[in-house]
Curated annotation (Swiss-Prot):
Enzyme Commission no: 6.3.2.9
Example GO BP: cell division
Catalyzed reactions: UDP-N-acetyl-alpha-D-muramoyl-L-alanine + D-glutamate + ATP = UDP-N-acetyl-alpha-D-muramoyl-L-alanyl-D-glutamate + ADP + phosphate + H(+)
Name of the protein this chain belongs to: UDP-N-acetylmuramoylalanine--D-glutamate ligase
Leading EC class: ligase
Coiled coil start-end: none
A single GO molecular function term of this UniProt record: UDP-N-acetylmuramoylalanine-D-glutamate ligase activity
Family indicated by similarity: Belongs to the MurCDEF family.
Any one GO CC term of the record: cytoplasm
Pfam families assigned to the protein according to its UniProt record, in alphabetical order: Mur_ligase_C (PF02875), Mur_ligase_M (PF08245)
Cystine bridges: none
Protein purpose: Cell wall formation. Catalyzes the addition of glutamate to the nucleotide precursor UDP-N-acetylmuramoyl-L-alanine (UMA).
Originating organism: Ruegeria pomeroyi (strain ATCC 700808 / DSM 15171 / DSS-3) (Silicibacter pomeroyi)
Length: 466
């Protein structure tokens, strides 16, 4: 646990008692603060009360002037589309609003660090797609290389649940736009921006607000090293803003769309080969084509970002390649779940938006595509530019018929996962790939994308076993 600093003897309100909220309450108590907790869910309140925390109905009693700070969980809106009433009341009263990420950055360093020869480092990863894979890959590479490393944030443990830093250790954080937007302190040693595509726009007031939330990771004091994907205009702009000149190697530019040139530090992948150039000279290369845990160009982008971050931490190209080759991949992200009768079955349930689905569609051949769900802002028309390898779409979700009508490829309205899997498997031939890449949210039929992916895998396995 990371005891929170700066609030000893003070009251701190905690709104939301899920994984991060309850961990925050514990860390506040460990730092000498009194956590005043609230969640609309009675079971969550009961769990907190069972650990001895004070329950205060912040909806009715508000955030009083005896409160030093309000800590908000990521799912609670603090500005758009409208601030939660408790947050609005705190802002009106002048009470600072923060989250567990801000508390982590103000509390992670300890007095014992004065005796370390090699200080602990923090790598923070943000972006629209690829955050989890990039974060997990960095963690895996470092672990395989023998570095003490912890994985936290949106993946792994709650950020305040991790152990204090030890000499030479690394913490890898996956951070969403909700987290970077609100955190009052953001000071990673290495910051990674994977890419940007429309997502969560209602929570940020539009695309500009969404980019601004991501960009804060690079603006709050600035990291020692910035790894920035430059395949979108926002990333290219951010890299330019961070750089002091063409040869400034504080910024490592990353691309999978083109060969990068110039005197700076670049990592790019072309035709399945990763290349690193620094000061105009090649410094490393990896053949990514046969790395099973990283299929497709989108995973090559993740590989480039992870490679750059690990190089910034001092690892050799050889050590990084060894880690990549043993990387098993993450569930629900281009996850090969079965191969039978010459047909490959892939679970990419995490492809919850158009951009992520397009990247999955570009990674495989002869695709029987299971898609559909709750469409996100911006629609799905852009999918039609990436359907060259799609033999047929099998559409699920409550809006399956409307979804199918927008696709310029042969489609069948299946509605449910069991029907879609049954139809795709019945029609699949050797050499085909049955791919779940929904391009939509899951909440019309499932609690989350994980449950959707698990349903797909269960339906596939049931039929293979039968």
């Amino acid at each position: 646990m990371i005891p929170v600093k700066g609030f000893a003897g003070a009251n701190v309100a905690v709104l939301g008692l899920g994984r991060s909220g309850l961990a925050t309450a514990r860390a506040l108590r460990a730092g000498g603060a009194e956590a005043l907790c609230w969640d609309d869910n009675p079971a969550a309140r009961e769990a907190a009360e069972g650990e001895g925390f004070t329950i205060r109905d912040l909806r009715k009693q508000g955030v009083r002037d005896d409160t030093a700070c309000l800590i908000v969980s990521p799912g609670i809106p603090h500005l758009y589309p409208a601030p939660n009433p408790v947050v609005a009341a705190a802002l009106e009263a002048g009470v600072p609003v923060d989250n567990d990420i801000g508390l982590f950055f103000r509390s992670f360093a300890g007095p014992e660090w004065d005796g370390f020869d090699t200080l602990p480092r923090v790598v923070a990863v943000t972006g629209s797609n690829g955050k989890s894979t990039t974060s997990a890959l960095i963690h895996h590479i470092l672990s395989e290389a023998g570095r003490p490393v912890q994985l936290a944030g949106n993946i792994g443990r709650g950020v305040l649940d991790i152990e204090p830093g030890e000499e030479g250790s690394v913490v890898v954080l996956e951070l969403s736009s909700y987290q970077t937007d609100l955190a009052r302190a953001l000071t990673p040693d290495v910051a990674v921006f994977t890419n940007l595509s429309p997502d969560h726009l209602d929570r940020h007031g539009g695309m500009g607000g969404y980019f601004a939330a991501k960009r804060r990771l690079f603006a709050e004091g600035g990291p020692d090293r910035a790894v920035i994907g430059v395949d979108e205009s926002e990333g290219l702009y951010l890299a330019g803003q961070m750089s002091e000149g063409p040869g400034d190697d504080r910024v490592i530019r990353v691309s999978v769309s083109r060969k990068l040139t110039g005197p700076g530090w670049q990592v790019f992948a072309r035709k399945g080969y990763l290349s690193e150039y620094r000061k105009g000279r090649q410094a490393g290369s990896i053949d990514l084509r046969d790395i099973r845990g990283l299929p497709g160009a989108h995973n090559h982008q993740n590989a480039c970002a992870a490679y750059a971050a690990c190089r910034a931490l001092g690892l050799s190209p050889k050590a990084i390649e060894a880690g990549m080759r043993s990387y098993p991949g993450l569930p629900h992200r281009s996850q090969i779940v079965a191969e039978a009768g010459g047909v490959t079955y892939v679970n990419d349930s995490k492809a919850t938006n158009v951009d992520a689905a397009l990247k999955a569609l570009g990674a495989f051949k002869r695709i029987r595509w299971i898609c559909g769900g709750l469409q996100k802002e911006g629609g799905i028309a852009a999918l039609n530019g990436g359907l060259a390898e799609v033999l047929k779409a099998y559409v699920i979700g409550r809006e399956a018929a409307g979804f199918a009508l927008q696709l310029e490829v042969e489609s069948e309205v299946c509605t449910t996962m069991d029907e879609a899997v049954a139809r795709a498997m019945a029609e699949a031939e050797p050499g085909d790939t049955v791919l779940l890449a929904p391009a939509a949210a899951s909440f019309d039929q499932y609690d989350n994308f994980e449950r959707r992916g698990e349903d797909f895998m269960a339906e596939v396995q049931k039929r293979l076993d039968g």
